[in-house]
A protein has these predicted regions:
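Gly/Gly-Pro-rich "capping" loops immediately C-terminal to redox-active cysteine motifs
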Residues: 48-50, 61-89
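The canonical Cys-X-X-Cys-His
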Residues: 55-65, 104
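C-terminal motif of bacterial Sec signal peptides marking the signal peptidase cleavage site
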Residues: 18-21
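C-terminal capping alpha-helices of c-type cytochrome domains
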Residues: 94-113
Length: 113
């Protein structure tokens, strides 16, 4: 095999892998908020993105942030309130207040439905 063939094959595999990775994650604009809006009237894309940002910024400080659909709604409702004080302690400030906690829980619900 020639060096050119190996190089071309490697580039092709890399490009296909990148395209597959980009297409596999839900983008924020592709999220369907219908279920969350039925459960939480007035829930908006702004609420979703705020909850998502709080989750991403705080819930991976001490451990990997879990996928929203990795736990049930009841499990999240049990664990998030227990984890918020630890996340705040790790941040050295109140990074997540009560309303932030609610936005995180609603984000997890919306992202898993």
């Amino acid at each position: 095999m020639t060096t050119r063939y190996l190089f071309t094959t490697a580039i092709t595999i890399a490009v296909v892998s990148l395209l597959a990775a980009c297409g596999s994650a839900k983008s924020t604009s592709a999220i369907n908020l219908t279920a969350a809006q039925a459960k939480y009237p007035g829930y908006s894309m702004a609420d979703f993105t705020t909850g998502q940002a709080l989750y991403a910024a705080n819930c991976g400080r001490c451990h990997p942030a879990f996928a929203p659909n990795s736990h049930t709604e009841a499990q999240w409702a049990k664990w998030v309130p227990k984890m918020v004080p630890m996340a705040n302690k790790e941040a050295g400030t109140v990074a997540i207040d009560e309303s932030g906690q609610e936005l995180i829980l609603k984000f997890l619900y919306a992202a898993s439905h």
